[in-house]
């Protein structure tokens, strides 16, 4: 708003002397040319000053500003973003703003000193200079015109800046995703060509998701992804999917979720451009849209990482919620209102029961996912899953009822309120013929069956209120295990399992290897023995802290020849690049666990090897396992028994060392426990041992320590030498029997002995540990010399029956021949 224009100068200030010399006028004109528009300001300022000094009453209270920098009128001040530290909506640090403001003030003061005090003098200073007395009314009109044009320019500049800011905020996704990030990825060489992802375009995948797929390097969808995506993303159906491990089930449900959320965001953006109030309301709240449950913490983090990679350039947040980590930190993550939450049932229910607002407000939940559902339904596990399912809002498939039954639907846009989709994925699937009829009945009696136990995938799907038209995708009928998986076994005793395992790791230890145990005690024993033998192994089991488990997983991913010893909890869904070998140190208790164990290798159409160590006590379980997998023949892993004596020598020393160290550590732990508890209770420990017993104990400990050092030294000497077969002799080397490989190995061994630098590191692929044999992967050894053995119980029984019949037949023939000979002898005697 502008104030009234300043009045003309009073008559006493106008020059009334006609004898004014013309030199003054010329000086004024020169000043006008040099100082531009500042002359009218000084004239108005002089007029205001003279008026105030004359004591006249000024009606306009803002007239005193006529000579200031404001230009004689009031207007909205134009804010410079740089002056207030605002860049793209973000405010700089206040201290930095103050420092910048101080620098600007100093610069202005320096300018004042250079120009002189008369340029910035305020009315009432008493020493104003009048320079344009002869201009009169023409000068005032010129000043007003310049002020109007200046005001229009400022308003226009402000409008342009505001429009540019709105454009940046509205097109933030397109500019960021299609601009800088894409350009950076292209420069890095991580994106495939557009013609290489034609199969994804046929599925009508969102362009931003196609960009993510190109960046991840997925040229075409896997069969499970191709089958599930149209039904889930475009038809809005529930999906029950089953496929072999490593087939891409995570993106099979992850991409439809991201597709739907992106489409809803685009609709919301279009509506917000038409109605600004809707945009303000939508920007305030981001409700929970997708809840994904997994049985293990590692799998939850892996699923979260995969979804984050797919949604890297999207305005969609994905947060993992698992046990073993700080609840306070996870609550802070949930305060950000992420659209997708991936977690385990235990920690999710713990946060729900404490009243976390983001998790209990499920009115806008559009996706509910159960990954590895066959593990979820095991009896005695995941009681929290049933409680979480009971908290889900009841919807019968109509949008109107969903809106009516939502208590706080005012904060959720209508386009976000969708029929909830339920996804159930597993590596195994067993559904009855009338499963769809059960689902139809389950929708009516969902509340009545809420108290039933989740004993099967059918019961789980029924309680999760899946719709009768759910899409069932079962790709496990032909082959449950990966196609390129080579299965094998080794028959040995329980005591020899360690020896054969060490043989595999030392002779064929190439590539990443996972060793599975059924018990934590066996895992600890095995990892301790392998570490004594110089093999650096990683461990992962349920009694470890979550940070240690995550660290072990990261270290396993980093090294190409790493070895991990884990329990069955690690067998579910974990995806590692290029795991070459899986070893079953102990057979699992069920076929499903065996499938998940073996599925850690041969993923993404790559080859892999599985080796099972079978003891006499495991034979019945092993044959039952083969029968359930419809396997009649299985390859027996080739073992060169000439190396086993050298392996047993090392293993014997390692077991003795491990036994002594375990005993010492147990004694130290007991002593520290007694001392710690005695100190906490304020008691003094008294030893009842006599002096002789103490001396005897000291001597025994000293002898044990000396024995331990000797054993360690002997083992170190053995480990410094390569494994030698029993028939190998260094004294008598037949020239004809020395192969080029053996000759090369002997030359290398002699060089090492001369240099004195022989060392063994079990995790280096270039190490030399075996004489007479080149180090190859177990898969290659199995393909080269593996022999198929019948593992079918029925066939073995048939073979035994045939062998028994043949034996009886032979016995009868022998008996008949003997009787025939006796008769002939008797007849011959009678004749004589």
Curated annotation (Swiss-Prot):
It comes from the Eukaryota. Residues 128-137 have a biased composition (Acidic residues). Its EC number is 3.6.4.13. Keywords: ATP-binding, Helicase, Hydrolase, Nucleotide-binding, RNA-binding. It is an enzyme of class 3 (hydrolase). Residues 230-447 form the Helicase ATP-binding domain. It catalyses: ATP + H2O = ADP + phosphate + H(+). The keyword Ribonucleoprotein does not apply. InterPro entries: DEAD/DEAH_box_helicase_dom (IPR011545), Helicase_ATP-bd (IPR014001), Helicase_C-like (IPR001650), P-loop_NTPase (IPR027417), RNA-helicase_DEAD-box_CS (IPR000629), RNA_helicase_DEAD_Q_motif (IPR014014). Residues 1-12 have a biased composition (Pro residues). Residues 1-59, 91-173, 800-832 are annotated as: Disordered. Residues 29-42, 105-114, 141-155 have a biased composition (Basic residues). ATP binds at residues 243-250. One of its GO terms (molecular function) is ATP hydrolysis activity. Residues 156-167, 814-832 have a biased composition (Basic and acidic residues). Residues 484-645 form the Helicase C-terminal domain. Residues 43-55 have a biased composition (Low complexity). CDD domains: DEADc_DDX24, SF2_C_DEAD. The Q motif is unique to and characteristic of the DEAD box family of RNA helicases and controls ATP binding and hydrolysis. Belongs to the DEAD box helicase family. DDX24/MAK5 subfamily. This is DEAD-box ATP-dependent RNA helicase 13. It comes from Oryza sativa subsp. japonica (Rice).
């Amino acid at each position: 708003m502008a104030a009234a224009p300043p009045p003309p100068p009073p008559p006493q200030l106008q020059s009334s002397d006609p004898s004014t010399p013309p030199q003054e006028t010329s000086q004024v004109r020169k000043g006008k040319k040099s100082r531009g528009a500042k002359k009218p300001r000084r004239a108005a300022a002089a007029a205001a000053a003279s008026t105030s000094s004359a004591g006249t009453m000024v009606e306009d209270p803002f007239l005193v500003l006529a000579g200031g920098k404001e230009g004689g009128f009031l207007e909205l001040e134009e804010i410079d973003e740089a002056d207030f530290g605002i860049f793209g909506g973000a405010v700089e640090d206040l201290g930095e703003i103050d420092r910048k403001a101080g620098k600007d003030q100093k610069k202005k003061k320096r300018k004042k000193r250079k120009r002189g005090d008369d340029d910035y003098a305020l009315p009432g200073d008493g020493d104003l200079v009048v320079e344009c007395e002869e201009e009169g009314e023409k000068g005032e009109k010129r000043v007003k015109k310049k002020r109007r044009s200046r005001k229009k320019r400022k308003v226009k500049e402000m409008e342009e800046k505001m429009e540019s800011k709105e454009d940046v905020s509205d097109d933030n996704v397109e500019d960021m995703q299609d601009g800088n990030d894409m350009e950076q990825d292209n420069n890095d060489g991580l994106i495939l060509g557009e013609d290489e992802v034609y199969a994804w375009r046929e599925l009508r995948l969102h362009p931003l998701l196609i960009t993510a797929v190109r960046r991840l390097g997925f040229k075409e969808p896997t069969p499970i992804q191709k089958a599930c995506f149209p039904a889930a993303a475009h038809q809005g159906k529930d999906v029950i999917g089953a496929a072999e491990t490593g087939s891409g089930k995570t993106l099979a449900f992850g991409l439809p979720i991201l597709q739907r959320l992106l489409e809803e965001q685009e609709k919301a953006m279009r509506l917000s451009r038409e109605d600004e109030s809707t945009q303000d309301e939508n920007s305030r709240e981001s409700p929970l849209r997708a809840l994904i449950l997994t049985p293990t913490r590692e799998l939850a983090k892996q699923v979260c990482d995969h979804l984050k990679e797919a949604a890297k350039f999207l305005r969609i947040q994905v947060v993992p919620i698992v046990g073993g980590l700080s609840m306070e930190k996870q609550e802070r993550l949930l305060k950000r209102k992420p659209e997708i939450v991936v977690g385990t049932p235990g920690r999710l229910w713990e946060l729900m029961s404490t009243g976390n607002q983001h998790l209990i407000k499920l009115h806008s939940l559009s996706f509910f996912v159960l990954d590895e559902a066959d593990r979820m339904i095991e009896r005695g596990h995941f009681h929290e899953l049933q409680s979480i399912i009971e908290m889900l809002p009841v919807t019968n498939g109509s949008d109107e009822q969903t809106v009516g039954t939502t208590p706080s639907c005012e904060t959720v846009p209508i386009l976000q309120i969708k029929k909830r989709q339920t996804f159930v994925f597993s590596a195994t699937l067993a559904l009855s013929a009338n499963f769809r009829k059960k689902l139809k009945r389950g929708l009516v009696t969902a509340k009545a069956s809420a108290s039933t136990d989740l004993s099967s995938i059918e019961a789980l799907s029924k309680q999760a209120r899946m719709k009768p038209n759910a899409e069932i995708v079962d790709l496990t009928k032909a082959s449950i295990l990966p196609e390129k998986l080579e299965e094998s076994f080794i028959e040995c005793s329980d005591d020899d399992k360690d020896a054969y395992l060490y043989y595999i790791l030392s002779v064929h230890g190439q590539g990443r290897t996972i060793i599975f145990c059924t018990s934590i005690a066996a895992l600890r024993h095995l990892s301790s023995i392998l570490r004594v033998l110089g093999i650096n192994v990683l461990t992962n089991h349920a009694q470890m802290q979550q940070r240690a488990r995550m660290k072990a997983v990261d270290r396993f991913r980093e090294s190409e020849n790493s070895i991990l010893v884990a329990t069955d909890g690690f067998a579910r869904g974990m995806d590692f690049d290029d795991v070459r070998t899986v070893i079953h140190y102990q057979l699992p208790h069920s076929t499903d666990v065996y499938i998940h164990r073996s599925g850690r290798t041969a993923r993404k159409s790559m080859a892999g090897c599985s080796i099972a160590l079978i003891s006499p006590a495991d034979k019945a379980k092993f044959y039952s396992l083969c029968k359930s997998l419809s396997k009649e023949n299985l390859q027996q892993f080739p073992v060169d028994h000439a190396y086993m004596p050298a392996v047993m020598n090392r293993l014997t020393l390692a077991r003795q060392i491990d036994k002594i160290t375990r005993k010492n550590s147990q004694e130290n732990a007991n002593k520290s426990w007694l001392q710690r508890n005695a100190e906490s209770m304020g008691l003094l420990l008294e030893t009842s041992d006599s002096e002789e017993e103490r001396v005897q104990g000291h001597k025994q400990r000293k002898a044990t320590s000396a024995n331990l050092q000797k054993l360690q030294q002997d083992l170190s000497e053995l480990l410094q030498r390569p494994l030698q077969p029993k028939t190998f002799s260094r004294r008598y080397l037949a020239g004809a029997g020395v192969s080029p490989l053996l000759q090369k190995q002997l030359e290398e061994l002699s060089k090492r002995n001369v240099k004195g630098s022989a060392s063994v590191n079990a995790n280096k692929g270039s190490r030399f540990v075996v004489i007479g044999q080149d180090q190859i992967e177990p898969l290659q050894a199995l393909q080269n010399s593996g022999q198929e053995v019948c593992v079918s119980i029925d066939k073995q029984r048939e073979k035994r029956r045939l062998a028994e019949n043949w034996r009886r037949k032979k016995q009868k023939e022998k008996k008949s021949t003997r009787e025939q000979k006796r008769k002939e002898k008797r007849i011959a005697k009678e004749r004589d």
